[in-house]
Regions:
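Charge-rich, low-complexity N-terminal segments
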Residues: 1-134
Length: 134
């Protein structure tokens, strides 16, 4: 399986509900480093997994929807703990929707087998969501 990864970052504010979260129950900020890895079984006619520039732009567009927001005030996350794990899945879903809409060019999204999204809270802690695209 071939893969191509792009990375970016975003900043949010949020809080959690539940004693398991300790002091993170209070409003706090987070800066996430994000990696999106696109995978396919064979390379395209140009020898690529996908256009790296389009992949980077697509990731940036998805993260711009979240950047500098207080997620506690976002209607789409009402009643949810926006944990690192949850956000990895949410970014995956948003990227997958853009892939289905053709954001990486004609036929590229259809050729991709899977996508993996990694959110890094720090150099020693991260979460990921991975899923098939076909």
């Amino acid at each position: 399986m071939y893969s191509l990864a792009v990375s970016s970052h975003f900043m949010i504010a949020h809080s959690f509900v539940g004693e398991v979260f300790g002091p993170a129950q209070q409003l706090h900020g987070a800066t996430y480093a994000v990696e999106a890895e696109f995978r396919r079984a064979t390379l395209d006619a140009s020898g690529l997994v996908c256009d790296i520039g389009l992949a980077a732009a697509m990731l940036k567009a998805v993260l711009d929807e979240l950047d500098f927001r207080n997620l506690d005030e976002a209607a789409e996350f009402s009643g949810r703990n926006t944990t690192t794990e949850f956000l990895a899945g949410e970014i995956f879903r948003r990227l997958a929707a853009r892939l289905r809409a053709g954001a990486l060019g004609s036929g590229t999204g259809d050729a991709l087998a899977s996508l993996r999204v990694v959110l890094r809270e720090s150099p020693v802690a991260w979460a990921a969501f991975e899923g098939a695209l076909a």
